[in-house]
């Protein structure tokens, strides 16, 4: 009835695609397949025609993704990391401790305990670093702008396994200081505005393939350097002031 991965040689696909006037048209009676249903059959055969397979096992093209969502309410888009993490709510004692250590915070939503955390002190304290490490799984957005960060501080930040956004602007950090961040496999946004990073930063950024956006204005990185390196970052937006 079908040839795996070859719709054009599959009898079932041929017959549902025939004109209704053709004596071999399927189904011979009842409602014919819609255009969208024919598309799905074609895609299913191309993917190997596995009866027992789930959608997660198939390569869903953007066209099929849109069709499944609009026609059947099936959302096959990959969920962002923050929606995949499953944690119990942060205990009140932790919230109090973080606030006493000069952090302001909010959860991403009522049902998502991951934290958007901002340090409001002049210099990141040892107490703050200890608390960040203690509650590392909860921290996904972190703003450490203008708080006199050191190389050692960045080694602690590299332990925040669920970090997706990191703001390091207005700190005297250099390119090599960022090397530990290659452990942050879910980091999507990195703000390096007004830091001391130079054009060597692109080698560091290559080691963080999850990045989608990097802010580089008011650094030692030139526009020419950004344009030269942009082909190496097809999925990353490199932002620099003109």
Where are these regions (language model features)?
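The leucine-rich repeat
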Residues: 26, 128, 149-153, 173-177, ...
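Conserved hydrophobic position(s) of the canonical leucine-rich repeat
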Residues: 139, 163, 187, 211, ...
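LRR N-terminal entry segment and analogous cap-like coil->beta motifs
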Residues: 77-172
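Leucine-rich solenoid repeat scaffolds
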Residues: 202-242
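Aromatic- and Gly/Pro-enriched helix-to-coil junctions and flexible linker segments
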Residues: 1-97, 101, 113-115
């Amino acid at each position: 009835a079908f040839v795996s991965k070859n719709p054009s040689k599959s009898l079932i696909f041929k017959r549902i695609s025939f004109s209704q006037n053709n004596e071999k048209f399927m189904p011979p009676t009842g409602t014919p397949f819609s255009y969208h249903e024919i598309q799905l059959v074609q895609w299913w055969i191309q993917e190997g025609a596995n009866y027992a397979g789930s959608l997660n096992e198939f390569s869903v093209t953007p066209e099929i993704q849109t069709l499944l969502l609009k026609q059947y309410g099936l959302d096959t888009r990959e969920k962002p990391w923050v929606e995949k993490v499953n944690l119990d709510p942060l205990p009140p004692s932790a919230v109090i401790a973080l606030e006493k250590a000069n952090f302001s915070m909010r959860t991403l939503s009522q049902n998502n305990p991951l934290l958007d955390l901002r340090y409001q002190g002049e210099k990141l304290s040892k107490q703050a670093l200890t608390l960040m490490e203690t509650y590392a799984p909860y921290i996904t957005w972190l703003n450490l702008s203008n708080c006199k960060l050191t190389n050692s501080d960045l080694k602690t930040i590299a332990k925040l396994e669920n970090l997706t956004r990191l703001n390091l602007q207005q700190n005297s950090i250099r390119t090599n200081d960022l090397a530990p961040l290659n452990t942050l496999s879910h980091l999507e946004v990195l703000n390096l505005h007004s830091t001391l990073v130079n054009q060597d930063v692109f080698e560091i950024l290559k080691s963080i393939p999850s990045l989608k956006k990097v802010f580089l204005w008011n650094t030692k990185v030139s526009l020419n350097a950004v344009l030269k390196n942009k082909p190496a970052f097809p999925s990353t937006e490199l932002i620099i002031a003109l």
